[in-house]
Swiss-Prot record:
Pfam families according to UniProt: Peptidase_S78_2
Gene: yqbD
Provenance organism: Bacillus subtilis (strain 168)
Keyword Coiled coil in annotation: yes
Extent of Basic and acidic residues compositional bias: 254-281, 290-299
Domain of life, per lineage: Bacteria
Biased composition range(s): Polar residues: 310-322
Protein name, as recorded: Uncharacterized protein YqbD
InterPro entries associated with the record: XkdF
Amino acid sequence: MPRELVNAKITHVSYVDKAANQKQFFIVKSEKQPDFQKEVRILAKEADEQKLVYGIVYEPDTVDAHGDFMTAAEIEKAAHGFLKDARQIDKQHDFQGGVGEVVESYVAPADFEMNGETIKKGSWVLVTKASEEVWEQIKKGEITGYSMAGTAETIEKQEKPVSQEKTDEKGLFNLLKNFFVGKQQQSYEEPVAKAGRKFSASNLQEIKNAHAALGNLLSQVETKEGEEEMTSEEVTKSIQEALEPIKKRLETLEKEEELNKKDKEKEEETEKEGEKLKKAISEAVQPLADRIEAIEKSRGTSKQTEESGSEQVQKSIWSGLF
């Protein structure tokens, strides 16, 4: 993710050699640790008697190798601040002066070319006059560019704006994928219980088929996403088609549940009616049983044992009815 550099304060410009060319331009934080690097090429070298060296310090809105960039306004602030408060030129960041001096420092007012190099509008161009020693190193190719030292604040920037609609669609697909293809997948391999009843094997197979259909939909969407973006209408239609089998099966299950509920209610009603009938018969027969018992008690003792056995048989018969 690119970082925007703001409020940069450049304190030194160094001549650097080829070995340091990979880290020619850098800005450090307040702890004086490097934050990013950018190669700055020397664009032109004037006649020996002048020893003038031209270079681009920074281009606006151009992300460097370390993912940093500056706007034209921030570059202008940094360039003006350096010219006003610093103007320090050293070599290899040794912070020892006397090796060069600032001749020109300006921000390009328009695009132009210099020695075949296109200078972009808003770029910071620096011209320095090198010392005799440094000039000889430049001619030999031992000094190849500038390196800047200073401080800057950073702001994280999103690399590419994403519309809310696309974000919502991607979030929906991820949600479906995680639910139907992720950890939940293993739960389908075991019986699914609901309200104290288990789904039958056929019902479970229907759910598995619907799960497979949704998985196929997700695969198609992911493939199509790599080729072209789907519209909201296409997304809605695809999901509705994939959910249609589940909707139909759910309606069937609800109807079956309703029928089972009605059957259970009928069974409970029948049991209640049976209990009422049993109670009515028991109440109607009980007076007869009482009268028989009274008659048997009034008979003689000689037949008491025999009649008692008969009474027990009769009572057991009555008892068996209820």
